[in-house]
Amino acid sequence: RAGWPKFDAGGGRARGEEEGVKDRQRMRVVKQRPVGRDEGSDKSLNREVKGGGQEKQIFRIDICLGRETVQNIKGMRFANTIFEPIWNRNYISSVQITASETVGVEERAGYYETSGALRDMVQNHLTQMLAITAMETPGRFDPEAIRSEKAKVLQAARLADELEPWNCCIRGQYGPGGSDGAPLSGYRQEPGVDPHSTTETYVAMKLFIDNWRWQGVPFYVRTGKRLAKRLSEVVLTFREAPVHLFDAAGGSPTANQLILRIQPDEGAEFKFEVKSPGSGMRSRPVEMEFSYDESFGEPSDEGYVRLLADAMLSDPTLFTRSDEVEAAWRLYTPLLELIEDSPWKLPIHPYESRTWGPAAADALLARDGLLWRRP
């Protein structure tokens, strides 16, 4: 992964031309994310790559789409009548999507300095998790039907404050800290990093999806390096009961939550209220849990294993289509341009290594009376 090479747009086209028409029909182009730097460069690269083949021969790989729990979001929704009828704005009050890492940039400083968390993680991983969580039910379980529904979600997504995006987007950068007594360097002290770098290693933002299902429901996404815990998850928080009939231990009843754990410990949790033992009617929160390993007795496949096998079999279900990628870049390009032209409007907020990120990210949710989940 060190010093990842820049994508050679003409490579696929040139090889296709060299091998002849017959072999070109069998050619597969597998593109690792992120490809391009914004909406314009992505469109240009897509035109170049398609010069050597058709869209059906291009497989844009995103490791998160190969993970069992990401795929299981569709399974839980569309195979169970208890979830899909309440998977909407009438019952869900907010959604949190998190992808946190405990490591720093490691040997990837050369790549990361020109990318940052917004391009490296938000534009692809988190956006795909959002699309799968929010997509409409496809008419059939077919690759193109599924990808079309994801594309519609991304085309309907927007920043919570498009006129003043600094009100809904927080950028951070990890500083020095400690872990089990061992000191950890800050991002600017990493080998290969500009000592005055303004590259973000953390992003948190608030989005809306302007469609019938999700109108008015905030989607909060966050990702960062050198955070307190390694995890990827989707948290759906349900609306509170309109009337509180029972006393709750510690105050008001807690909102029901469905937590989909992508990694580690792949599985799901459902949090709800029950009556506490004893006299009186007091409620307390409890959890039901599903563990992939415990239920199936084997660890799930690594994402790349499944994805590369699917590419060889020409199954595009778990790969992103060009219109999905373009919609994602269209969503974030205004932020990228703002960072480029007026970086002081989206300043870098420092945070200590092995914490949960900058205080400004907590304030983003606090304005809505919410907290980030910290497992």
Model-derived regions: residue spans:
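Secretory/organelle targeting and membrane-embedding segments
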Residues: 1-30, 35-375
